[in-house]
Swiss-Prot record:
Composition-biased stretches (Low complexity): 603-618
Protein known as: Chaperone protein DnaK
PANTHER family xrefs: HEAT SHOCK PROTEIN 70KDA
Gene3D superfamilies documented for this protein: 1.20.1270.10, 3.30.420.40, Actin, Chain A, domain 4 (3.90.640.10), Substrate Binding Domain Of DNAk, Chain A, domain 1 (2.60.34.10)
Gene name in the database record: dnaK
Entry annotated with the keyword Nucleotide-binding: yes
Length: 639
């Protein structure tokens, strides 16, 4: 069997590692570098990947793609994608299914297609080192990636000729890299992962005893549209604004100038991590009727920090949520690990240090740790690494829409995966022959406030009164964090399935917003839940009362029947509104109006069921005696 390689498919840079002699080894690419820029360029006759693509970007900005990971598994109409549409030099378009795609030289391409080019280079790098074909890989994704984004990443692997054996979360991979050699003790580690395009925080417990190691993710949070690219963009916009003030020209309208500006901004940002001031000097950046124009701007570290301060602050809220979800305080964290190139910025390190009250570890390479962890996980899957157990989680709650537009959760956020959950539901109407299973992701009670992941129908339900059919809905999250849903009619055995596909993209900003909304609207959700409960109880009472009126027939006096029908109409009107008190008042009035109906029903039941009731009492008495005897016997034993 060939080697399974570990790939960190990053927004800005990618990295590949493999187990060599029992140790994870980061491999150098054809250019001699241990990391490869996640940049792809298309020319007339070839596809260029990595550093060569980066070098030619200035002369080919419209056909050079970077940060493509920010588009993977996303919808074109997402706010995050729309922001990128306005600043990227290449063309982002809407696919027929609404996904965000890109266009180069008239060719429309899906992000997984473009990402596959990076994976192909990683595959070739590993094959050159190993001297054999590579067909299997473990690929990392941000912990807060949703089902669509995970599925799209697997698709990219398949396009690159790789069977993706496992999708692993980036912070978890970094924890594996850090903890694999820690042979004794129990450590709780916070992994702060600020990469080129995504941010994750994971709280992970590493338990090492007698050679056995368990890596258990306690909680995770993040934002998959926050990273080094956003820091770069702040600096790019600042430089463009300064140039416009001085020269009156807007560089944003010139793709060639913007590509040069991007390179200069990235270089300046890196330099300011080790120096207090740098100069961006771009001669002949553009020209007008008066001649060529040059851009010369001095930037201090303090200026850069002021430009990105709010971005750094944005990373702190997920830290608080993750700690709360793990039921831990800052003092419970033993070690803090920094992952991702953007964590080299001193201001980021300072913010993390201040939050946790301790210095982050310096012995983890922020650019390579994730790939190393992926290679270790590959070793676990191939059997080369033993006595290591990895327990990851799903970042958001999953459920279905039920009666009253309520989201009923089947799997809560931060549940260890793989996992399964099932629950039995029923029909809302008499003789209902089909049900729609609407799959949702989020934390809100109101279905419409969550994200729709997909829906499907279960047909062929046999006619029956509402509430009688039993429809079992099963959620199954695999080890990659990808969701599979099935619905089965327990009587007929008829079954329907759905796997969440990339076309149902859910942006992580939406995910983060759902969690924030759930916290901010906890009281609102509670009131909505109570309203729906009252509405459902009222509907159920009307349904039952109608049946009892029919069964009572002529035994029900006309006056009482008229009162009951009027009360039922009042309830039906009330349930169409959103006034819980009005619904409950109308429900109580229906109960009171139905007093005569209850008397008739009880009298009828007593007449028809006397014999059965007597038998039941006898049976219960016997059963009670048996229980009492056992109970007494136990008590005697204790004495």
């Amino acid at each position: 069997m060939g080697k399974i390689i570990g790939i960190d498919l990053g927004t800005t840079n990618s990295c590949v590692a493999v187990l060599d002699g029992g140790k994870a080894r980061v491999l150098e690419n054809a250019e001699g570098d241990r990391t490869t820029p996640s940049i792809i360029a298309y020319t007339d006759d070839e596809t260029i990947v990595g550093q060569p693509a980066k070098r030619q970007a200035v002369t080919n900005p419209n056909n050079t793609f970077f940060a493509i990971k920010r588009l993977i598994g996303r919808r074109f109409k997402d706010d995050e994608v729309q922001r990128d549409v306005n600043i990227m030099p290449f063309k982002i378009i809407a696919a027929d299914n609404g996904d965000a795609w890109v266009e180069s030289r008239g060719n429309k391409m899906a992000p997984p297609q473009v990402s596959a080019e990076i994976l192909k280079k990683m595959k070739k790098t590993a094959e050159d080192f190993l001297g054999e074909e590579v067909t299997e890989a473990v690929i990392t994704v941000p912990a807060y990636f949703n089902d669509s984004q995970r599925q799209a990443t697997k698709d990219a692997g398949r396009i690159a000729g790789l069977e993706v054996k496992r999708i692993i979360n980036e912070p978890t991979a970094a924890a594996l890299a850090y903890g694999i050699d820690k042979k004794q003790g129990d450590n709780i580690v916070a992994v702060y992962d600020l990469g080129g395009g995504t941010f994750d925080i994971s709280i992970i417990e590493i338990d090492s005893n007698d050679g056995d190691q368990t890596f258990e993710v306690l909680a995770t949070n993040g934002d998959t549209h926050l990273g080094g690219e956003d820091f770069d963009n702040r600096l790019i916009n600042y430089l463009a604004d300064e140039f416009k003030k001085e020269q009156g020209l807007d560089l944003r309208k010139d793709p060639l100038a913007m590509q040069r500006l991007k390179e200069a901004a990235e270089k300046a940002k890196i330099e300011l991590s080790s120096t207090n001031q740098t100069e961006v000097n771009l001669p002949y950046i553009t020209a007008d009727a008066t001649g060529p124009k040059h851009l010369v701007v001095k930037i201090t570290r303090a200026k850069l920090e002021s430009l990105v301060e709010d971005l750094i602050i944005r990373t702190l809220e997920p830290l608080k949520v993750a700690l709360a979800d793990a039921d831990l305080s800052v003092s419970d964290i033993n070690e803090v690990i920094l992952v991702g190139g953007q964590t080299r910025m001193p201001k980021v390190q300072e913010a993390v240090s201040n939050f946790f009250g301790k210095e982050p570890r310096k012995d983890v390479n922020p650019d390579e740790a994730v790939a190393v962890g992926a290679a270790i996980q590959a070793g676990v899957l191939s059997g080369d690494v033993k006595d290591v157990l990895l327990l990851d989680v799903t970042p958001l709650s999953l459920g279905i829409e039920t009666m009253g537009s309520v989201m009923t959760k089947l799997i809560e956020k931060n549940t260890t995966i793989p996992t399964k959950a099932q629950q039995v539901f029923s029909t809302a109407d008499d003789n209902q022959s089909a049900v729609t299973i609407h799959v949702l992701q989020g934390e809100r009670k109101q279905a419409s406030a969550n994200k729709s992941l997909g829906q499907f129908n279960l047909d062929g339900i046999e006619p029956a009164p509402r509430g009688m059919p039993q429809i079992e809905v099963m959620f199954d999250i695999d080890a990659d964090g990808i969701l599979h849903v099935s619905a089965t009619d327990k009587k007929t055995g008829k079954k329907q399935n759905i796997t969440i596909k990339a076309s149902s993209g859910l942006s992580e900003e939406e995910v983060a917003q759902m969690v924030r909304d759930a916290e901010a609207h906890a009281e609102e959700d509670k009131k909505f839940e109570e309203l729906v409960q009252s509405r459902n109880q009222a509907d159920g009472l009307v349904h039952a009362t109608k049946k009892q009126v029919e069964e009572a027939g002529d035994a029900l006096p006309a006056d009482d029947k008229a009162k009951i029908e009027a009360a039922m109409s009042a309830v039906e009107v009330a349930t169409k509104g959103n006034d819980k008190e009005a619904i409950e008042k109308a429900t109580q009035e229906l109960i009171e109006a139905s007093a005569k109906l209850m008397e008739i029903a009880q009298a009828k039941a007593q007449t028809q069921g006397g014999a059965q009731e007597g038998a039941a009492k006898q049976s219960n008495a016997t059963a009670d005696d048996v229980v009492d005897a056992e109970f007494e016997e136990v008590k005697d034993d204790k004495k």
